[in-house]
Amino acid sequence: MAMSLQGSRRASAGSRRRTSPPVSVRDAYGTASLSSSSNSGSCKGSDSSPTPRRSMKYTLCSDNHGIKPPTPEQYLTPLQQKEVCIRHLKARLKDTQDRLQDRDTEIDDLKTQLSRMQEDWIEEECHRVEAQLALKEARKEIRQLKQVIDTVKNNLIDKDKGLQKYFVDINIQNKKLETLLHSMEVAQNGVAKEEGTGESAGGSPARSLTRSSTYTKLSDPAVCGDRQAGDPSNTPAEDRADSGFVAADDTLSRTEALEASSLLSSGVDCGFEEASLHSSFNLGPRFPASNTYEKLLCGMEAAVQASCMQERAIQTDFVQYQPDLNTILEKVGQAQGCSSVLKDRHSELDLHPSGPRDPDSAVVVTVGDEPEAPEPITRGPAIHRPAVNSNPGLPVSVVCPVEEEEEAAAAAAAAAAATTTTTTTEKEPKSYWSRHYIVDLLAVVVPAVPTVAWLCRSQRRQGQPIYNISSLLRGCCTVALHSIRRISCSLSQPSAGSSGGSQL
């Protein structure tokens, strides 16, 4: 009996287990959990089982009157509960993995952004460093430029000082050129005046009385009262030719001769008797009778006549006089050209071969309308008292001692060539230009080349002229050089002709 009871109980329990319907279980997330696969095959329950009725009975809250139903999990077996937990964990794991993937994606995006930001920051840093380096270089360049500006300023200051010195030098040169031009003008005017006075002073006693004038008329305006003084047109051509005036003679001999004549004239002014006493002296032992001595003697006698302004007899024999006058006579004798004296003497010897041979003899020349033959005087020296001529129109006789030396005739032939050369040189006109045009052009242009080069090379400041006065003058002379040379040549030819006419 007992065995049957236990078997019936086991069968009822197994039937219960088999007849238990599948229960839908909801987890905490609201998901339905299915029954186990092991119970699926045995679950052929009937309608009379009490468990399904309960579940169907308490499905609504209004049915159980506010009492919460028990969780369906408590009716599951532990294995089913484990399965449910595993499923729940898998779902959570899946959600977590999805979240992790999303966060990894976000992290990747953030990393990408960070890398971009880093790159941008690096670029900005590079730009900043480059800007700092450029700033440093710019500061260095600014310093260098400041140094360059300072050096340029110093150089400009030095150049300005140099330019000021150059301008001062240029002004000095301009002043020198102006002074030179002025002096040249004065010299040209003086030469022209000397030529004019030389032509008019053909009968001056200190210059024009040569040995040839002893045998001709005296053309002094003071002696000949009917002629005007200083007028070359009133002087005959033969008188001017015999006067032997040379415009280019030395000034020293002229002044010394004038001093001699002034001394004689002062001696005449002292008084008539004193002049007659002083005018009679003898230089025989000290000065032998020579051509120069005769020339000076005749010049002094003519000066005495010019100062007295009267026609008087002039004595030819002299006594010893003051040593000052003798010194002057020595200087004048040394200043005279010996060659011209010898040539004149030789020509005179040829013209007058029949003259007296006595060294103490003299020749009397009558100054009048027509020259007369020389009158030889063979007597010794005698003292003559000057007497006033009552008739001023009568001629005046001048007595000059003559020395006939044989050595002079021999020396005249030796000095003829030198005299001809000197006379030709004196006849040549003065010319400031050369024979070739190119030489004159180079002489005018070459001194202006450094100034022009300096003006072209230097930096011209505002208001500074681009020309130099000296270079401008030279440029004008260069342009008009041909005309200047032609005008100068045309001016020098008439002067040469006039001077040649006044010479012997």
UniProtKB/Swiss-Prot annotation:
Residues found modified as Phosphoserine: S200, S204, S219
Disulfide bonds: none
Biased composition (Polar residues): 207-217
Keywords from the UniProt entry: Coiled coil, Membrane, Phosphoprotein, Synapse, Synaptosome, Transmembrane, Transmembrane helix
Keyword hit for DNA-binding: no
Biased composition (Low complexity): 7-26, 33-49
Disordered: region residues: 1-74, 191-244
InterPro entries per record: Syntaphilin/Syntabulin
Domain of life per record: Eukaryota
Modified residues (Phosphothreonine): T214, T235
Topological type in the membrane: Single-pass membrane protein
Coiled-coil segments: 79-161
Transmembrane segments: 437-456
Biological process annotations from GO: neuron differentiation
Compartment(s) of residence: Membrane; Synapse, Synaptosome
GO annotations of cellular component type: cytoplasm; cytoplasmic microtubule; mitochondrial membrane; mitochondrion; neuron projection; neuronal cell body; presynaptic membrane
Subunit relationships: Binds to STX1A. Interacts with DNM1; this interaction inhibits the binding of DNM1 to AMPH and DNM1-receptor-mediated endocytosis.
Role according to the record: Inhibits SNARE complex formation by absorbing free STX1A.
Protein's name in the database: Syntaphilin
Organism lineage string: Eukaryota, Metazoa, Chordata, Craniata, Vertebrata
